[in-house]
């Protein structure tokens, strides 16, 4: 089965970084899942899971949250979401990720 892999970046609502995103899309997907990884994680840990889902007709999309994975250009920023209430940037970034994925799926 052919799997289309798309990567790119979008500006985080935090203004602190550009979030790296990933999309694994099978031919004629019957469903899509958006993954939101945990603390100290990053999307690429889930490549095997993405391929499993694609083999079963399900697309997987997600991004490295602010302060995580390839969304960090300075290692001192690992785990940093921003000032008080910074977690809301992550939530808003997930909404951006959803809108972006709808263009491709």
Q: Where do the PLM segments sit?
A:
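Conserved alpha/beta-hydrolase
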Residues: 52-75
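N-terminal cap/lid segment of alpha/beta-hydrolase-fold proteins
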Residues: 1-25
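Alpha/beta-hydrolase fold active-site loops
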Residues: 30-33
